[in-house]
Amino acid sequence: MSTRAAKVLAERAIIESIYGLKVRSTEEVQDMVAANFSGKTESKTAATIRGIKIEEITYDSSKDIAKATASIVLDKFTNIDGQEMNLAGKLFRRVAFATSTPSQAGPVQAMRAAEIDAYKQLAKRVVGFTLESETTVENYILTSDVVKSKVLATMYLSEVTEYGWDSDGDAFVKMVLNVKDVGDILGLDVVNEEELIEVEGMGAQIDDFRQAQQD
């Protein structure tokens, strides 16, 4: 069961890399206190594709966690924005993890959270975001401070360069977008100060912000 699930999730990762996904995110901080932080990121994708190969599957029986590596080589493909991409035989490879034991799901769920956070960070860097701020000072004392940010974008052709977990079990995913390559693939003259945009997404097994609110 774990290996089958890992295969499907690896296929999803391939589709998100090539076809792309929609990312919607909101973040809010109140009164400059980290415990008052709230953030939510949602993603969505749907595409028809053929030719994905499962290169390798490994299974850790002690943790009931499976890892699947998927790859595909494509010449042309239409992305989420309806743009035809000339991929010229480019190889895409992604991995995914899954488990059939709920008690072991924490690490793999944290990894997915880190992946989505990386997509959000890329969207903020590439497309931009909207920020709203309201501050009130009464008699020289700060009485209210609210900052909100919003992101809504489609992302595609990003690549994962590194991933893993730290000693606390929190996950990280390093993701990169080669702006020049994207321009060449789309046949567009993309102007950007950075040719290579790199971000690192983070994912946790425990909601530290919610715990801080309860303390």
For every predicted segment, state its role.
Residues 1-215:
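Domain-level marker for long, solvent-exposed, non-transmembrane regions
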